[in-house]
């Protein structure tokens, strides 16, 4: 099962997930920032770039045995850091 809570979509079944992902017309690129987890729960943080536009993405993957039982993905567009926080923060490479 693949869920996109932000758009309210749920895709069931491996073939449907494969077809849904293969049918996307955009050119995509993935840059993995980190993968953490253990046992039946793994989280991937990556930048998904569609046609040159980056989206910061978190993918939560739940396993049942050696198969993916559920993947939930969240997407966020980059934004300009406000000047009001500048004195407390340091800039990150993105």
Question: What is each stretch, according to the model?
Answer:
Residues 1-94:
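C-terminal and inter-domain tail/linker signature
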């Amino acid at each position: 099962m693949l869920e996109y809570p932000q758009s309210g979509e749920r895709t069931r079944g491996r073939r449907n997930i494969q077809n849904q992902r293969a049918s996307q017309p955009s050119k995509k690129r993935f840059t993995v920032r980190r993968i953490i987890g253990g046992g039946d729960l793994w989280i991937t943080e990556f930048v998904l770039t569609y046609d040159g536009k980056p989206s910061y993405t978190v993918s939560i993957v739940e396993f049942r045995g050696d198969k993916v039982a559920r993947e939930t993905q969240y997407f966020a567009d980059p934004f300009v850091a406000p000047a009001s926080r500048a004195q407390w923060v340091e800039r990150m490479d993105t």
